[in-house]
Amino acid sequence: MKKVCIFSAQYLPTVGGVERYTYNIAKQLQKKGIDVTIVTSRISKLKEFEIENGIKIYRLPCYNLMNGRFPTVKFNGEYRKLMRMLKKQKYDLVITNTRFYIHSLVGVTFGRKYAKRNIVIEHGTSHMSVHNAILDKMERIFEHGITWLVKRQCNEFYGVSQACLEWLGHFHINGISTLYNAVDMDDINNLLNRKDDMRDKYSIPE
């Protein structure tokens, strides 16, 4: 059975576009007989691990910055325990949603080392704004910095729309194609069925 792991800093029961997109991908993959794991943030008092409708959900400990809008991973004992559990799996594909969270960097780093394929799906079309000139400037510096780090771990980027692909160009990233909210399962299946293992191609040790 093929196995896919999806890193998404935010997920249900938090409601938003990325959360719904992640859920839809997971359900569509599941219908294809694929084993799906979601790695998200433990924003509220939810369990660190549970299985919902056949989908395994790991919730990494985090700081709830900006009232939960910007969950930031806590690299503590609980984090290390959950990551050890994940490293025991053999994933065919790791999908990381968005690229500007610390969670995203964790996802692409994990995917590069422990999965056959490793991709990022972009959801944004502009910089985040908190309507404060100084904080917005700091956000831009941070976003460019973390995107640079993400690019070092992953070279396959997609967008949920053409506008997202164009926004990737702002960071000197050439997006491959779109994976719309409707989810083009043919594209996902093509990724899963490609024979080349990125770890072997780039001599990445486990």
Question: What is the role of each PLM region?
Answer:
Residues 116-117, 126-153, 159, 166, ...:
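Nucleotide-sugar donor phosphate/pyrophosphate-binding loop at the beta->alpha transition
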Residues 4, 93-95, 108-128, 143, ...:
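Active-site proximal beta-strand in glycosyltransferases
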Residues 42, 163, 182:
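Carbohydrate-associated surface elements
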Residues 62-94, 101-109, 113, 140-149, ...:
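An amphipathic, basic-hydrophobic alpha-helix
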Residues 1-56:
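N-terminal subdomain of nucleotide-sugar transferases
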